[in-house]
């Protein structure tokens, strides 16, 4: 299976980098994982910034037409680990076994961007810093593969 995480910015704090690298190494056993980092537009009027960043995402997504796209959005449906297991299992069993998770820009997506996707969910109803969101997502993906493979998860 191939999983890509499309996100804005780079991990810049050692503790985030260490945590991410730990889960990244663990996941190699189960999945081909790639991180795609985009440079976020931060200057200008809020709606214009949202549009520019969303357009940048849409342009980048053209390279991944055969991937199932999953948009992470704080205002979307809250999911559990079990829900994520089903999303990944379904993709493993019935689709191309390619998933692209999208972690949006800090100011959020444009309305038109969000409206163009049906597969959206939230990891939490609290706002997470982007770097922490990336860690939570990769940890949950790792947990999912431990569950799918009936392996014990060591906390």
From Swiss-Prot:
It is found in: Cytoplasm. InterPro entries: Alpha/beta_knot_MTases (IPR029028), RlmH-like (IPR003742), tRNA_m1G_MTases_N (IPR029026). One of its GO terms (cellular component) is cytoplasm. S-adenosyl-L-methionine binds at residues 72, 104, 123-128. The keyword Cytoplasm applies. It comes from the Bacteria. GO terms for molecular function: rRNA (pseudouridine-N3-)-methyltransferase activity. SUPFAM superfamilies: alpha/beta knot. It catalyses: pseudouridine(1915) in 23S rRNA + S-adenosyl-L-methionine = N(3)-methylpseudouridine(1915) in 23S rRNA + S-adenosyl-L-homocysteine + H(+). Keywords: Cytoplasm, Methyltransferase, rRNA processing, S-adenosyl-L-methionine, Transferase. Its EC number is 2.1.1.177. HAMAP family: 23SrRNA_methyltr_H. PANTHER family: METHYLTRANSFERASE, RIBOSOMAL RNA LARGE SUBUNIT METHYLTRANSFERASE H. Homodimer. Belongs to the RNA methyltransferase RlmH family. Specifically methylates the pseudouridine at position 1915 (m3Psi1915) in 23S rRNA. This is Ribosomal RNA large subunit methyltransferase H. It comes from Mycoplasma mycoides subsp. mycoides SC (strain CCUG 32753 / NCTC 10114 / PG1). The gene is rlmH.
């Amino acid at each position: 299976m191939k999983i890509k995480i499309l996100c804005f910015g780079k991990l810049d704090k050692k503790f985030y980098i260490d945590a991410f690298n730990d889960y990244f190494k663990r996941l190699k056993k189960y999945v081909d994982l790639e991180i795609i980092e985009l440079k976020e537009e931060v200057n200008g009027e809020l709606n214009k910034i949202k549009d520019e960043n969303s357009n940048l995402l849409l342009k980048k997504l053209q390279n991944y037409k055969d991937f199932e796209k999953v948009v992470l959005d704080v205002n979307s449906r809250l999911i559990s680990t079990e829900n994520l297991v089903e999303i990944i299992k379904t993709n493993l069993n019935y689709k191309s076994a390619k998933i692209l998770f999208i972690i949006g820009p800090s100011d959020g997506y444009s309305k038109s961007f969000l409206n163009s996707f049906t597969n959206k969910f939230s990891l939490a109803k609290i706002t997470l810093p982007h770097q922490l969101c990336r860690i939570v997502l990769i940890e949950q993906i790792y947990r999912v593969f431990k569950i799918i493979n009936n392996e014990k998860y060591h906390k």
